[in-house]
Regions:
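Sec-dependent N-terminal signal peptides
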Residues: 1-6
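C-terminal motif of bacterial Sec signal peptides marking the signal peptidase cleavage site
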Residues: 12-15
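N-terminal helix-rich structural modules
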Residues: 20-221
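Short His/Asp/Glu-rich catalytic/ion-coordination signatures at enzyme active sites or charged loops
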Residues: 30-45, 94-113, 135-177, 237-277, ...
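Active-site-proximal, well-structured secondary-structure segments within enzyme catalytic domains
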Residues: 152, 181-184, 191, 195-237, ...
Length: 435
């Protein structure tokens, strides 16, 4: 009985402590630039933060709609712009994490959050009293406002129109359903692609078949095999790109073929996973979206807000690139194939899984240098500081200074202040970069 009472009291105390703890995602950050304090943020904070932020925006939207005063830029356009600040903040923090370090826990939260955000977007986009207030301000003030205010008004009004605010009621309902379905399909596709990539492994039964790899790569293959159940002594894990770096070193051509095919077939139905039906349905729904909005196809609809503007401009740009690059690519391919035939015979035909391998050998013979020799010059820090930061400075006048007082969500991540030489001395700090 005493033990039971003690356990119950402990549970109550723990619950009270949790209730008293403020969600750091919803609190104003005390860190420089308002950076999220990852030393305080827990995985369990994200879903409640989204729920709270979404409810906050709903309440602010309701306040705009219920305002008895005539619609103005301040009480409607600016108020609407401000209404989603917290949702935007939580989203930026969370989705940066999903792109860089997606754990099973984060994946489950994402599955719960995406429909919530889509439902919120539907509610706002098809909130006719809200749109009527926005339209009143647009019709009255879009030619008299200046600068940023005019730009914000135009962007707000046009975004509502692009999402279907002017559609008949039946088409609005269809657009809502399409939005929700696409969100669901995209989640399924992302989950399957991640599963396919994580499961894409080529098992190797002997060290001899790994000839050409350096000892560090061979040791990594051994560790990867052990961590994945040890079906064979070695495993080549497929990374999330079509071409695989190890193809440049593997002497065994059949193994190169297996690695390449494991990469390109990871989710096309050759193995357990097939995303074709998902992609096909997404494409059909996007085409229907475009048709509802009066566009000939989804490309025309999606490109309207981009620099390219139209599919025709994209095709023209691609054709100009092909005209310039294809002859060079063909010449290079022939040179690599001719080089390979010196050792493989005149009938040798260069396959996609051969290109990296013979290109590296040709470079080594012509320039007397190998990829292994230059790897030491391409450490992460060197690429970042001597490559990315150097180029940004030369091209845009940006400089970077590391900050060690801003917590990150991963020990390898670094934070840098970003300065611009285009501004005066007191205004040169323009933000931060997490890398």
């Amino acid at each position: 009985m005493t033990i039971a009472i003690s356990a119950a009291l402990t549970s109550v105390v723990s619950s009270c402590q949790q209730a008293q703890r403020k969600n750091p995602l919803l609190e104003e950050s005390k860190l420089p630039y308002g950076a999220p304090d990852f030393s305080k943020i827990k995985t369990s904070d994200y879903l409640p933060a989204f729920e709270s932020a979404i409810q906050e925006q709903r309440e602010k939207i309701a306040a705009i709609v219920d305002n008895p005063d005539s619609a103005t830029f301040e009480n409607t356009i600016l108020a609407y712009e401000e209404s989603g600040r917290m949702v935007d903040h939580v989203s930026r923090v969370f989705f940066a994490l999903t792109e860089a370090e997606k754990t099973p826990e984060i994946t489950e939260i994402e599955k719960a959050v995406m429909p919530m955000l889509t439902e919120l977007e539907n509610e706002i986009s098809f909130n006719m009293p809200l749109f009527e207030r926005i339209r009143q301000v647009y019709d009255r003030d879009h030619e008299t406002l200046q600068g940023e205010e005019q730009k914000l008004l135009e962007e707000t009004y046009k975004e509502f129109v692009r999402k279907g605010a002017l559609l008949p009621d039946d088409k609005k309902e269809r657009m809502k359903a399409i939005n929700l379905r696409i969100t669901d399909l995209q989640q399924q596709w992302g989950d399957l692609l991640l599963e396919a990539t994580n499961n894409a492994v080529v098992w190797v039964d002997s060290k001899e078949k790994l000839a050409g790899l350096n000892e560090a790569d061979i040791e990594q293959c051994k560790k990867d095999a052990e961590s994945r159940g040890g079906k064979a002594p070695y495993a080549i894990v497929i990374i999330n790109t079509t071409q695989q770096p190890l193809l440049a070193s593997l002497d065994n051509r059949d193994l190169r073929r297996q690695v390449y095919e494991a990469s390109i077939h990871r989710s096309d139905g050759t193995g357990k996973i097939n995303t074709y039906s998902l992609v096909s349905e997404i494409a059909k729904l996007r085409a229907e979206q475009a048709e509802l909005m009066g566009y000939p196809n989804y490309a025309a609809y999606s490109l309207e807000k981009t620099m390219a503007k139209t599919p025709e401009n994209v095709y023209a740009f691609l054709k100009s690139l092909i005209a310039q690059y294809k002859p060079e690519a063909d010449t290079e391919t022939k040179a690599i194939e001719d080089f390979a035939r010196q050792t493989e015979g005149a009938d040798f035909h260069l396959e996609p899984y051969d290109r990296f391998y013979y290109s590296a050998k040709m470079k080594n013979q012509i320039l007397n240098i190998s990829d292994d020799e230059i790897k030491s010059y391409f450490t992460v820090d060197s690429v970042l500081i001597n490559g990315v930061f150097y180029a940004a400075n030369r091209a845009y006048g940006l400089t970077f200074k590391q900050r060690t007082d801003i917590p990150t969500y991963h020990p390898d991540m670094k934070v840098f202040e970003v300065f611009s030489l285009l501004y005066s001395e007191e205004n040169r700090e323009i933000g931060r970069a997490h890398v």
